[in-house]
Each structure stands twice: as C-alpha cells, then as structure tokens.
C-alpha cells in the first residue's frame, strides 16, 4: 500500500515537473533555466535588500515597492533585448535574405549583465548585514562585470 502511494506521488510529481519544464521551454526556449535563475536572483535580491533595510532601521513599503517595480523594469528590458533581435532576424530573412541570427546575442548579453548585477547586489546586501562573504566571490563578480562592460563601447556623440 505504501509503495503504491509513493509510486502515485512520484508519478504525479514527474507529470507536474515535466509540464512546468515543458511550458518554460515553450516560453523561454531551451535555456529556460537561465531565466529561472535570474528570477530566483530577483527574489533573493529583494529579500536580502528588505532584510538589510530592516536591520539598518530603514525599512519602508515605498522603498520595497520601488525595488519590486525596478525588477519588473529589468524584465521589460530583457524582453525588449530579445524582441529587437527577433524582429531584425525575421526582417533580414524575409526582406533582405540575410541571416542575422547572431543578433540574438544582444538578448543574452543583456540577461548576463543583469544577472551579474543581481548576484553582486545579493552579495553586497549580505556583506552589509554582517555576513562573511568569501572574497573570491566578490572579486570574481567584479572582474566578470568589468569584462562584460569592456566588450561594449558606446562612442560619444560630438555634435
């Protein structure tokens, strides 16, 4: 009897987990787990920021709402960063006969940059709360951020 109940539970769990993965893959593609990781980092950053504010006596619902709105804004940036290449890829294929598939890297670059920023923010919040965060994590993320930003140079407009 216990074995049958366990098997039923495992079967249901597998069906639900498989359905969730299928839906996430449908929406976000093969690398859905990167988006899920970013969402997890959003939540952890918001929670560690809230904890830091509470510990420092600076907790306010206005600041919490502002932080949540900022996270929504980041998701909009990611959506736009993937939407623009998708439009240009189809335009290049349909109108110009050119493969512009490499433009999807703009979306991945944007997501990666924001992911590094979220992780750094989580670690900074923990440091400010008195946690002993290993130095290699902080330095490693700083180096990663520098490398990401070194790859992009925006020329100044001298009109």
Protein language model features and the residues they cover:
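Membrane-proximal cytosolic segments adjacent to transmembrane helices
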Residues: 1-12, 116, 120-159
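Mid-chain, well-packed structural core segment of small domains
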Residues: 70-111
């Amino acid at each position: 009897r216990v074995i049958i109940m366990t098997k039923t539970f495992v079967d249901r769990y597998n069906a639900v987990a498989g359905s969730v993965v299928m839906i996430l893959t449908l929406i976000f593609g093969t690398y859905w787990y990167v988006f899920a990781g970013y969402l997890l980092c959003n939540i952890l950053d918001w929670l560690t920021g809230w904890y830091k504010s509470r510990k420092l006596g600076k907790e306010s619902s206005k600041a919490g709402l502002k932080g949540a709105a900022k996270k929504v804004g980041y998701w909009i940036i990611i959506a736009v960063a993937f939407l623009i290449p998708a439009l240009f890829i189809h335009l290049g294929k349909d109108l110009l006969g050119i493969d512009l598939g490499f433009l999807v890297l703009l979306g991945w670059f944007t997501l990666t940059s924001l992911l590094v920023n979220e992780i750094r923010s989580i670690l900074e919040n923990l440091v400010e709360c008195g946690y002993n965060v290993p130095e290699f994590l902080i330095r490693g993320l700083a180096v990663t951020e520098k490398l990401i930003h070194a790859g992009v140079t925006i020329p100044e407009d001298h009109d």
